[in-house]
Amino acid sequence: MLTAEKVKQAAKAMGADLCSIGTPDRWEGAPAQMDPRFIMPEAKSVIAFGFRIMRGSLRGIEEGTFFSNYSSMGYGGLNWLYIPHTMINMAKYIEDYGYEAIPLGHLSPWRAIDNVGNLKGGSRPVEPGKPAPDVMVHLRIAGFLCGMGEIGWSKVFLTPEFGPRQRIGVMLTEAELEPDPIFEPHLCDRCMLCASECPGAISAERSVKATIGGYDLEWNDLDCDRCRDAFRGGEYAEEGEKGEYMSHVGQEGIKPSPITPFYRRPNKVYEHGEAICGGKGCIRACMIHLESQGKIGNKFKTPFRRKKLWSVDWSQPDPLQIAGE
């Protein structure tokens, strides 16, 4: 007999750090384009899996010396390699008990909606009453409805085990498993360090409110376009300034910001990434704050930030070029 406890034990054995279970009826009232019941109408359980972002994968950016590791080992490698591997094996495990399982994983590259929920117009419903493919299950909301954690002001998902340091995978199954209670939000105390240390996208004033699973939730109204540029190390050039940081990828008017040492935006790692900011506000500042309060179960013998944070002054000449003259 397949039980929730067996599923959680198998998930840990196969590489997940967290596993929690919800029921599809918790999505009642969700937008059709984000409702998992349209993907598997006979689903009895929704399973959320958490995969830690190693604190060490952020170390190179914190020191300003090794930037690619977070984008590879803490970001793209998790999303494109590690999470799919674990999810596929978990789906096989459940199907060996005779229950169909869909390993949605972390990615939805063919989704019908954009980052703010608007239809992109690239597909149409196959019949009346159905949403346009592909339906995209909102991962952070799935994590919340499965009882894994909460959505912080930054819009990043927080858990008592790792704070903001995890990525989420989702699975649907026809197996009926005992659900976990929805997580009572309490980790985010609205310190707003995520906003004050973000290089350009998190608002401390504007917010989005939604009632989900019986809870009134609120997070910042994230400017996704600014986040796209800022987390890659870019900021908008003023009139008269050069804006060539992303010109090699067809985007003009962007200059390097103080959080990047690179003259040009680096290439992608595992299909996406270029996460030059290393979650400066939404992950690192949040993590430091929650660790200082003792709210994170994954504890370390030393604090993460050990000296003043660096900043690149692009108005000054490159010291290596000066040394070579």
Model-derived segments and spans:
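Non-catalytic, usually N-terminal nucleic-acid engagement modules in DNA/RNA processing proteins
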Residues: 1-88
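N-terminal and secondary-structure boundary signal
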Residues: 1-14, 30-33, 112, 164, ...
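Flexible, active-site-proximal loop/turn residues at the rims of small-molecule/cofactor binding pockets
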Residues: 25, 53, 177, 204, ...
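Catalytic cores of enzyme domains
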Residues: 30, 72, 76-288, 298-306
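Short alpha-helix boundary/capping motifs
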Residues: 39-40, 122-123, 310, 314-315
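Short, solvent-exposed secondary-structure capping/transition elements
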Residues: 58-59, 102, 295
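C-terminal/domain-terminus segments
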Residues: 291-321
